[in-house]
């Protein structure tokens, strides 16, 4: 069959053929090969790596499915892996659920699944259990994916936004808004093809460079809502305020151009391969050096600080501070 049919989700022969010829082959690993209703994971590896489990789930509905730098499949691995990794854990296992629209081209599904398998394998992640549903035309837009992931948090790592205090500083691991601007360019046909590429990446290797540095306090990956959403979460968790410097924000010229053209702010744009990191001030130089030593952190910068006065503010290019509010809604729906 060249297209997904309702029969592919019925539990019958068509579904078994899809599972065996596509998912089992692409995601092949010992846990999946058991074909039980659940993945049976040996605790020994997890216990050896930490004393707590980090467990996260996310759903992916991005439109379009394919974009410069990635696709919904790569995103479904990177996004959930990063949500686990910012705890200090190394993501090891993922589940995967597909909701497919009747009529979806089989080649589209194969391309997405192949990308998922390649991304997971490169990151040392096993997709150990999954599910597939097919719904009638129009009940879903082409293809939605849910993934859940887990890893073990080392006993000596206790990162968390509630530990922030006045005097701490904030770093970002690279340029802001690459993913959001890339998707916006595609949707609005702004003609910047070639200049904009999503930053979609698994950040575990970058985060590992920070695990042994004293003074690292909290990490978040700045996805929906961008850096602005993360700093508001940090401020709410610690009960302090946060002040950012506009002049310090690393933004690529093409992304800045999109923002100026449409009256948007890169601080609110989604990223899929960037960290916001809170550290003690005296650790900032060492953390920046570690980030700069890795390709995923080469554009890292110190962008702000935690202050006693509550609220989130942005110091403009001429030093004037203004309150930085969260938008009422995501400026770019279905961004991930």
Swiss-Prot record:
Modified by HypF, which adds a carboxamido group to the thiolate of the C-terminal cysteine, yielding a protein-S-carboxamide. The carboxamido group is then dehydrated by HypE itself to yield a protein-thiocyanate. The keyword Lyase applies. The modification S-cyanocysteine is found at residue 336. Pfam families: AIRS (PF00586), AIRS_C (PF02769). Its EC number is 4.2.1.-. Keywords: Lyase. The modification S-carbamoylcysteine is found at residue 336. It catalyses: C-terminal S-carboxamide-L-cysteinyl-[HypE protein] + ATP = C-terminal S-cyanate-L-cysteinyl-[HypE protein] + ADP + phosphate + H(+). One of its GO terms (molecular function) is lyase activity. InterPro entries: HypE, PurM-like_C_dom, PurM-like_C_sf, PurM-like_N, PurM-like_N_sf. One of its GO terms (cellular component) is ATPase complex. Pathway: Protein modification; [NiFe] hydrogenase maturation. GO terms for biological process: protein maturation; protein-containing complex assembly. The keyword Lyase applies. Homodimer. Forms a complex with HypF. Also forms a complex with HypC, or HybG, and HypD. PANTHER family: CARBAMOYL DEHYDRATASE HYPE, HYDROGENASE ISOENZYMES FORMATION PROTEIN HYPE. Belongs to the HypE family. Involved in the maturation of [NiFe] hydrogenases. Along with HypF, it catalyzes the synthesis of the CN ligands of the active site iron of [NiFe]-hydrogenases. HypE catalyzes the ATP-dependent dehydration of the carboxamido group attached to its C-terminal cysteine to a cyano group. The cyano group is then transferred from HypE to the HypC-HypD complex or the HybG-HypD complex. This is Carbamoyl dehydratase HypE.
């Amino acid at each position: 069959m060249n297209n997904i049919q309702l029969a592919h989700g019925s539990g019958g022969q068509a579904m078994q053929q899809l599972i065996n010829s596509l998912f089992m082959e692409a995601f092949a690993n010992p846990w999946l090969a058991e074909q039980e209703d659940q993945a049976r994971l040996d605790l020994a590896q997890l216990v050896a790596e930490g004393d707590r489990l980090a467990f996260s789930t996310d759903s992916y509905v991005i439109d379009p499915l394919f974009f410069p730098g990635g696709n919904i499949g790569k995103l479904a691995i990177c996004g959930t892996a990063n949500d686990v990794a910012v705890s200090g854990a190394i993501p090891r296992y993922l589940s995967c659920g597909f909701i497919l629209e009747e009529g979806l081209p089989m080649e589209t599904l194969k391309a997405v699944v192949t990308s998922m398998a390649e991304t997971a394998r490169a990151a040392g992640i096993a997709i150990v259990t999954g599910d597939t549903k097919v719904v009638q035309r129009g009940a879903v837009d082409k293809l939605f994916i849910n993934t859940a992931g887990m890893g073990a948090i080392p006993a000596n790592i206790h990162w968390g936004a509630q530990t922030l205090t006045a005097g701490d500083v904030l770093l970002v691991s690279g340029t802001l808004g690459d993913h959001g601007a890339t998707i916006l360019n595609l949707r609005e046909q702004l003609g910047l093809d070639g200049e904009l590429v999503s930053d979609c990446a698994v950040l575990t290797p970058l985060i590992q460079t920070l695990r042994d540095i004293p003074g690292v306090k909290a990490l978040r990956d700045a996805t929906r809502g961008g850096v602005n959403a993360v700093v508001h979460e940090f401020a709410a968790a610690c009960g302090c305020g946060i002040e950012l410097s506009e002049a310090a924000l690393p933004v690529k010229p093409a992304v800045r151009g999109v923002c100026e053209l449409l009256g948007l702010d890169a601080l609110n744009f989604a990223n899929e391969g960037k960290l916001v990191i809170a550290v003690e001030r005296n650790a900032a130089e060492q953390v920046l050096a570690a980030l700069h030593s890795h390709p995923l952190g080469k554009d890292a910068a110190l962008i702000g600080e935690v202050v006693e006065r509550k609220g989130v503010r942005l110091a403009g290019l001429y030093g004037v501070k203004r309150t930085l509010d969260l938008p009422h809604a995501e400026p770019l729906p279905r961004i991930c």
